[in-house]
């Protein structure tokens, strides 16, 4: 029975094994689950063949297959373990040891074959799984690398974009800071310009206030002056005309006393009255100079011929003394020396006042001419103009002082002359002075009344 089974198994094994082996695929693309399914099916075929039986020669033929040799060689531990298990399982079913030995060997070979084939299929499945897994892992790794590369490229692009954005932001911030700095500088310059304009305006207001106060001061002086009203020049002209009429009366009285050979006390009284009347005209001129010094200096209140011989608003004391020396002869040597000394001192004082007037005129001209030009209508032009006018006004104030000093020199010269001369000589000197100015006035009248044909 056993031999038949073995023969039948041998035939089936001989005829069936190649077809079974050829049907096994080399590689399974289905993955791990398909390999497990094939392995379980092959295990079922192995159990069926165990029930059918195989010959030892078939096992030898199977072992000569290079496929199974490689599998057995590669997995000796698995075959040994399975064969041992089958030997232990099948050994009690045999009745005698010699008979059981071939069967055990046959079963061992069959079990080795089945285990080898199963193991080989399992190895194929594992290799397929490994191959598919490697492909999957490789594809996954490649996909991951690509993704990593894409991510890195995206990150690098993001970083580059961030760098570009950062550069743009930094550049924009720098531009904003520069614009803010320029804005602050413009604001500072504008504030400084406003401050300068405010200072110039304040200076201009001060100049205007000072000029206004000076104008009010001059106006108050003109209003408070004796014999001089609001119209200073006209009032002075009228006052001088009245003085001239009174002076003529005093001169006529003096002439009558001299011609009548009045006593010295009587004649001295008349001479003192005429001298006091001269003092009155100096006082009127001083008040008029406070109102309008140019009118007094110009001599518009005198005739044209008198103006030709004017010196700082009146006559020259030295020239007047020179005329009187020839009119007062005979004079003693002491009187001549006194008059000569008086003439020299008067001449020196006249020269000093004349030099002072020239220096004043030159300084006034330089003040008006040395102003730095400025744009028309600008605040600097107005301030410069007002500054020049203020300085000129201050210098013009000294003209009144020159006129007052010249009148004092004339008044003192007359007084010194009266001290040198006797009463009758002083009376004759006053009459000679009046005659001189009367002839100048008459010359002016004749000049103005000359025929018009002579003007051509």
From Swiss-Prot:
One cellular component (GO) term of this entry: nucleus
Pfam families: bZIP_1, DOG1
Coiled coil (residue ranges): 167-220
Residue intervals of the DOG1 domain: 233-450
Location within or outside the cell: Nucleus
Leucine-zipper, as annotated region: 194-208
Record field: compositional bias (Polar residues): 9-41, 125-141
Basic and acidic residues: compositionally biased ranges: 158-169
Domain of life of the native organism: Eukaryota
bZIP domain segment(s): 166-229
One MF annotation (Gene Ontology) recorded for this entry: DNA-binding transcription factor activity
Keyword terms: Activator, Coiled coil, DNA-binding, Nucleus, Transcription, Transcription regulation
Family that this chain belongs to: Belongs to the bZIP family.
Name of the protein this chain belongs to: TGACG-sequence-specific DNA-binding protein TGA-2.1
Organism this protein belongs to: Nicotiana tabacum (Common tobacco)
Encoding gene (name): TGA21
């Amino acid at each position: 029975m056993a031999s038949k089974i073995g023969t039948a198994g041998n035939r089936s094994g001989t005829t069936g094994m190649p077809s079974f082996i050829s049907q096994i695929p080399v590689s399974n693309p289905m993955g791990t689950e398909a390999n497990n399914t094939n392995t379980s099916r092959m295990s079922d075929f192995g159990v069926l063949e165990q029930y059918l039986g195989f010959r030892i020669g078939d096992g030898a033929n199977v072992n000569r297959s290079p496929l199974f040799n490689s599998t057995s060689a590669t997995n000796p531990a698995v075959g040994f373990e399975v064969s041992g298990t089958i030997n232990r399982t099948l050994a009690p079913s045999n009745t005698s040891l010699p008979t059981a030995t071939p069967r055990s060997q046959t079963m061992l070979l069959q079990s080795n074959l089945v285990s080898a084939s199963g193991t080989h299929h399992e190895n194929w499945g594992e290799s397929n799984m490994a191959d598919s897994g490697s492909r999957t892992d490789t594809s996954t790794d490649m996909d991951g690398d690509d993704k990593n590369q894409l991510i890195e490229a995206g990150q690098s692009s993001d970083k580059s974009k961030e760098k570009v954005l950062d550069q743009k932001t930094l550049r924009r911030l720098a531009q904003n800071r520069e614009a803010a700095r320029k804005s602050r500088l413009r604001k500072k310059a504008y504030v400084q310009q406003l401050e300068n304009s405010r200072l110039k305006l304040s200076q201009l207001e001060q100049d205007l206030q000072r000029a206004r106060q000076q104008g009010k001061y001059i106006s108050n002086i003109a209003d408070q002056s004796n014999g001089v009203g609001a119209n200073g020049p006209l009032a002075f002209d009228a006052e001088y005309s009245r003085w001239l009429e009174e002076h003529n009366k005093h001169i006529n009285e003096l002439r009558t006393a001299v011609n009548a050979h009045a006593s010295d006390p009587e004649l001295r009284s008349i001479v003192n009255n005429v001298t006091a009347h001269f003092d009155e005209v100096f006082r009127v001129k001083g008040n008029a100079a406070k109102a309008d010094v140019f009118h007094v200096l110009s001599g518009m209140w005198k005739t044209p011929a008198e103006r030709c011989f004017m010196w700082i608003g009146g006559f020259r004391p030295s020239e007047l003394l020179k005329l009187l020396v020839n009119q007062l002869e005979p004079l003693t040597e002491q009187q001549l020396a006194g008059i000569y000394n008086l003439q020299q001192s008067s001449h020196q004082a006249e020269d000093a006042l004349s030099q002072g007037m020239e220096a004043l005129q030159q300084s006034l001209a330089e003040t008006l001419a040395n102003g730095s030009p400025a744009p028309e209508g600008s605040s600097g032009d107005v301030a410069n103009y007002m500054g020049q006018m203020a300085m000129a006004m201050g210098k013009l104030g000294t003209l009144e002082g020159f006129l007052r000093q010249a009148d004092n020199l004339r008044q003192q010269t007359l007084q010194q002359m009266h001290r040198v001369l006797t009463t009758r000589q002083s009376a004759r000197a006053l009459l000679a002075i009046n005659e001189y100015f009367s002839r100048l006035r008459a010359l002016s009248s004749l000049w103005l009344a000359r025929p018009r044909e002579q003007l051509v």
